[in-house]
UniProtKB/Swiss-Prot annotation:
Protein name: Pectinesterase
The family this protein is said to belong to: Belongs to the pectinesterase family.
One example GO MF annotation: pectinesterase activity
Sites where the protein binds substrate: R19, W21
GO cellular component: extracellular region
Amino acid sequence: IDAFQDTLYTHTLRTYLGRPWK
């Protein structure tokens, strides 16, 4: 679940900023 949460958070940031966060 921790990994899923991290991915979801990163995906949200990427969508919000409109840039790839990696």
